Amino acid sequence: MATVNQLVRKPRARKVAKSNVPALEACPQKRGVCTRVYTTTPRKPNSALRKVCRVRLTNGFEVTSYIGGEGHNLQEHSVILIRGGRVKDLPGVRYHTVRGALDCSGVKDRKQARSKYGVKRPKA
């Protein structure tokens, strides 16, 4: 335990919080260009072909972003928007692609949770 005198001379150091999404640089979203679109397999015990893409961001970072929803129209050189949010069973994937923004289309025939997949309200 430090004495009062020691604390007067040198106050306690504050802990610095480390960001989970460093490439966003404290922004809500960032724009980038797909450099590679591919599928990868999740960690045990899950099994699937998860759709992901490598993205070169406007700030120079290159990150891996998950493409949520069923089906997508992304290919190399597509301009997309990414947001934070990791995918628990894909190591190294800390970002999500925003569906329905820029070159990334919304999910076709989506009826529920539409706002998460960039789908407009269907005609009644």
UniProtKB/Swiss-Prot annotation:
GO (cellular component) term, any one: small ribosomal subunit
Keyword terms, alphabetized: Acetylation, Methylation, Ribonucleoprotein, Ribosomal protein, RNA-binding, rRNA-binding, tRNA-binding
UniProt GO molecular function: rRNA binding; structural constituent of ribosome; tRNA binding
InterPro entries: NA-bd_OB-fold, Ribosomal_uS12, Ribosomal_uS12_bac
GO process terms (BP): translation
Pfam families: Ribosom_S12_S23
Residues bearing the modification 3-methylthioaspartic acid: 89
Post-translational modification N6-acetyllysine, affected residues: 108
Complex formation: Part of the 30S ribosomal subunit. Contacts proteins S8 and S17. May interact with IF1 in the 30S initiation complex.
Similarity comment: Belongs to the universal ribosomal protein uS12 family.
Summary of the function given for this chain in its UniProt record: With S4 and S5 plays an important role in translational accuracy. Interacts with and stabilizes bases of the 16S rRNA that are involved in tRNA selection in the A site and with the mRNA backbone. Located at the interface of the 30S and 50S subunits, it traverses the body of the 30S subunit contacting proteins on the other side and probably holding the rRNA structure together. The combined cluster of proteins S8, S12 and S17 appears to hold together the shoulder and platform of the 30S subunit.
Full protein name: Small ribosomal subunit protein uS12
Annotated organism of origin: Escherichia coli (strain K12 / MC4100 / BW2952)
Gene giving rise to this polypeptide: rpsL
